[in-house]
Regions:
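Conserved ATP-binding subdomain of kinase catalytic cores across diverse folds
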Residues: 1-113
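Short, flexible loop/turn elements at secondary-structure junctions
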Residues: 38, 76, 92-94, 148, ...
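C-terminal catalytic region of ATP-dependent kinase domains
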Residues: 63, 167-230
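Residue-level signal for well-ordered alpha-helical segments
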Residues: 2-4, 38-39, 46, 130, ...
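Active-site acidic catalytic loop and adjacent metal/ATP-binding pocket
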Residues: 143-183
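ATP-dependent phospho-/nucleotidyl transfer catalytic cores
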Residues: 89-149, 171
Length: 230
């Protein structure tokens, strides 16, 4: 297990998102976002959720499925209070001057859309895929549905317009799909070992996780899409 405690911290790089604290470190000459485990919102018996493990495992599964995916490393970090936590390091894929543009930001440029960039309605997302002009729409459409299928396989309940996108070089006027990232909501991160065991021993619990939940964060008619229905 890698110990990231003594890695140099870049205090001038900060990150958004509500899923755990994050800092920027340098490890073996490269920039990484270090993600800390968030407190679970549902399972009060857990000190921290398994989001870091989910991030690491899900990203590697995406990679095995043929997706270009962010590089992730599991490790630990001891804070100033002496508390050691399991963390995941996500390599900065904007090294080299490219800029990440979330799909939400690109969708905001589609002035014919009825919703803003973070609008979750499937029809609005597909319209934006057709209307945007920085990437071939047929390839983007294919990527969107491939990612949707992989997210369904991994039980990702939080893939939204703000956690996938493009790497852009404005000077060269070029865009490419960003590696898949932000997979910490896959693989039921708030299930502890005992509850995992209970699910695996109960066919009704397994069926619920196939047919009922998790749902996609994308909506149709204002209702979250059932992965099974697609």
């Amino acid at each position: 297990m890698i110990d990231f405690t003594n890695c140099p911290v870049n205090r001038f790089r900060a990150y958004g998102g509500a899923n755990g604290n994050k800092i920027n470190i340098t490890y073996q000459g490269h920039s990484y976002m270090l993600k800390f485990p968030p407190k679970p919102s549902r399972n009060r018996d857990m000190s921290y959720s398994n989001g870091c493990i989910s991030e690491y495992v899900a990203c590697h599964i995406f990679e095995m499925l043929g997706f270009r995916t962010q590089e992730t490393l599991l490790g630990n970090y001891t804070d100033s209070r002496g508390k050691t936590k399991l963390v995941v390091a996500c390599r900065d894929f904007t090294e080299g001057g490219k800029r990440l543009i979330e799909f939400a930001h690109l969708k905001n440029t589609c002035i014919n859309s009825e919703q803003n960039g973070y609008g979750k309605e499937l029809s609005s997302i597909l319209e934006a895929i057709e209307e945007q002009s920085i990437y071939p729409s047929d390839e983007l459409w294919q990527f969107f549905w491939d990612m949707f299928i992989a997210d369904a396989f991994l039980g990702n309940f939080d893939r939204h317009n703000g956690n996938w996108g493009f790497l852009v070089d404005e000077e060269k006027q070029q865009a490419e799909l960003a590696p898949v990232y932000d997979c910490g909501s896959c693989l039921y991160p708030q299930l502890d070992l005992e509850r995992m065991k209970n699910v695996l021993q109960d066919e009704a619990e397994i069926d619920q996780r196939i047919y009922t939940f998790p749902t996609s964060s994308i909506e149709e008619g204002g209702k979250k899409i059932s992965y099974f229905d697609y």
